[in-house]
Amino acid sequence: MNIELTDTPKDQDEAFVIAQVQKYSSRFIVRDQRSLCVFARDGNGIMIGGLTGRTNWQFLEVLFLWVHEQHRKTGLASKLMAMAESEAIKRGCKNARLDTFSFQALGFYQKLGYQEVGHLPGFGGQHTRHFLHKSLCTGA
């Protein structure tokens, strides 16, 4: 047996491990992962905001949300989130999840109805990572 520790793994080695986990998991749940992105551009076609995420297992997972500093506090981030949530519901999602750091937008997400389900302190020695959930079911 040979055990290797590396910070420069071969792409095929990483892909193999991921594929094996997915193969095992597929016995229990159908994998239906699809990208879901929303982009906002100004009149010149310059990106001023964007959301990247995916839907899978009836969940919307928001990975990144960004709005250019000049366009913050204008409601743009809320529009991006609403569009993503609406599309996720059309795809059959019942829940949404995301995480954010203490120096990012915890209060913003809470105003949108996200509830903290956990947190981990100590990132970079001083920051906390917050994990949030929101039900996308009507009336919930």
Which residues does each PLM region occupy?
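Short coil/turn segments at alpha/beta junctions that flank glycine-rich nucleotide-binding fingerprints
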Residues: 31, 74, 91-94
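Conserved active-site tyrosine of GNAT-family acetyltransferases
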Residues: 17, 109, 114
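Acetyl-CoA-dependent GNAT
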Residues: 3-63, 68, 103, 122, ...
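Conserved catalytic-core motifs of GNAT/GCN5-like acyltransferases
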Residues: 97-99, 115-131
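Conserved short alpha-helix immediately C-terminal to the canonical SAM/SAH-binding motif I
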Residues: 80, 104-105
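Conserved acetyl-CoA-binding loop-helix of GNAT-fold acetyltransferases
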Residues: 73-86, 111
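Conserved GNAT acetyl-CoA-binding A-motif
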Residues: 88-101
